[in-house]
Structures are given as C-alpha cells and as structure tokens.
Amino acid sequence: FLEVDSNEIHKYFIDPNFLKKNNFNTNNIISVFIPNTYEFYWNTSAEKLRKRMLKEYNSFWNRTRRNKASKIKLTYAEVSTLASIVEKEQNIKKDERPMIAGLYLNRIYQNMKLESDPTLIYALKDFSINRVLNKDKKVNSPYNTYKYKGLPPGPICIPSINSIDAVLNASDHDYIFMCAKEDFSGY
C-alpha cells in the first residue's frame, strides 16, 4: 500500500498540463495504467507514481505496437478503449478476442454504431446486468454505443495486455455482427 492519499494521486493524474502534454484527457487517462506487477516504496509520492506509470506506458508502446496502432488508425488511448470493450465482451475465452476486435474495427471503419452491451452497462453503472434490454438503450451517455457512433470517450475498465494485443492483432474478416450462445459459452 502507498502512504500517499488517493485524492492526491487523482489530482496529479488529472492535472490539465500533464494531460495535454501527454495526449490524454480526463476520460482516457486510465489507459496510462498498463496491467503489470510494479514495486513502489510505501512512501512514493503521487508525482513519482505518475512519472513511473507514464514511463511504463511509453515503454509498453514500443515501435511494433505503435506501428500496429497506426495501421488500424487508432490512437493508443483508442486502442485501450476498444481493448476494454473487447475485455468485457469476452473475459473467458481469450482466443476469441482478436475476432471480436476485428468485428468492432469493421463497425468503426463502416461508420456503424458499436452497439456494445458492456459500454451500455458501464453507462448505466449497474454491473449486475446480465442481459441488456431495449429500455436500457435509452440512457443518454457518451458510453451508450447503441445511441452514439464511434468509440466511447475512454476505457470502461483497465484492459489486459492480452486484450490490447488482440486489438493490435485483430482478425481480418468481414464480420459486423455476433450473437452470444445462450449459455454464454461463446459466439
């Protein structure tokens, strides 16, 4: 555990100068956190924590990953946002993530709505929802991808490296629709 107060950490990460300098905003700053095991001294300051997370983020986005993000025409934060959707869409069968990522990229490229249940659940802030209903789709939120086209403003969770890489290595196919099996065992 860190001694520094969580409000202090929050303040450092949403500092307008830091956000602007590093191409983040308050919606997508969560993408600076790359899942890994990090060691910190208990008395690490908020400033040093932010500096370390930015260093890890920049290290993670190596030339190969940067080139792949460019190839699919997404910023790093957009990759993280899409990866968070893929993560929540398929959190059991990781081998299906590149296919799901490809499907969402196809929708983006065709200027379609993503119509992602996980983003709607995030918008509703009701994480007990197992099945999205038509009444749920009426919520007015930029995270309602049934209502608005394109990616939501930021990630809906901190995506795993596996999900980020699934987006960067998305399957090349023409799929734009999927249907989950009734028992949620796959698509």
Segments predicted by a language model, with ranges:
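Bacterial extracytoplasmic/cell-wall-associated proteins, especially those involved in peptidoglycan
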Residues: 4-187
